[in-house]
């Protein structure tokens, strides 16, 4: 089965071809980072308009790279939610228009399910069951994954997502957009232990997260620097130390909660997905913990940590292989800007 995947939930336009027998044949991605940078964040209307411009050229690119014709495609999977309503509508409209014109079925995919399953695209994918740590700009969750479509929420953020905390901290430090990579880069120049920030809910006894207090702690430290009239090299060093303190605190919480989830479920496999899953400090800490605690940790390829069409094509193919009745030829679609992943549990 050959599935075309279309991702357009936020500020990346991604298309891909996934074949159940041959794996990922091709994927193409356009990021809108340069366009949104001057505004300091994603502008939804601009994001939607750019998806319209980029989708069809990317389609031609993946068809050529995958050596496929439209006649070869068996189904079209698209991101149905969650995400920006306008951006989702663009992707859903294009998917259903192509499907109608080509006489193909469609299937709407949960964006986070795509992330959750994306490590299955690696050469040696993790077998079920496993614990999944989903960390992105909008979501931070721990899930028990028994099979495709069989998900149990173990814990989630009560306020800011980890990626959101990274982005807000970047703004407080006067860094550019996107903030997460900028904070991590600055943190590498900081001195470990120079600034120690709180680890919210580290000992809460559950698997939930909270990052708003950590962000507030960064704000408090920045106000102290302003009151001290720090400037020049002194201010640069202080910001690097503060960034290091923030990253260390966030990583400590993510690792500790992941270890607690593995202990609770008695599983030995951890899958990490989402944009924050590309963070070098988080990967290093989890790899070190895996060596000490005797569990396996799996990630998608770095290129597939961000939003992409490959994960949507994969999720569509896996669902259609298990539940062919989920294929639709109605073409009267809806999108779900808010959509709980646990609601997919069968």
Curated annotation (Swiss-Prot):
* Cofactor entry: Fe(2+)
Tell me which residues bind substrate: 134-138, 167, 180, 279
**GO annotation terms (biological process):** tRNA threonylcarbamoyladenosine modification
Chief location of this protein within or outside the cell: cytoplasm
Question: Which N-terminal residues, if any, form the signal peptide?
Answer: none
User: One GO cellular component from the entry?
Assistant: cytoplasm
Q: What residues does Fe cation bind to?
A: 111, 115, 307
Reactions the enzyme catalyzes: L-threonylcarbamoyladenylate + adenosine(37) in tRNA = N(6)-L-threonylcarbamoyladenosine(37) in tRNA + AMP + H(+)
Localization recorded for this chain is: Cytoplasm
Where on the tree of life does the source sit, at the highest rank?
A: Bacteria
The note on cofactor binding and number reads: Binds 1 Fe(2+) ion per subunit.
Q: What is its EC number?
A: 2.3.1.234
Record-stated family: Belongs to the KAE1 / TsaD family.
Record-linked HAMAP family: TsaD
Return the protein name. Answer: tRNA N6-adenosine threonylcarbamoyltransferase
Question: According to the entry, what is the taxonomic lineage of the organism?
Answer: Bacteria, Pseudomonadati, Pseudomonadota, Betaproteobacteria, Burkholderiales
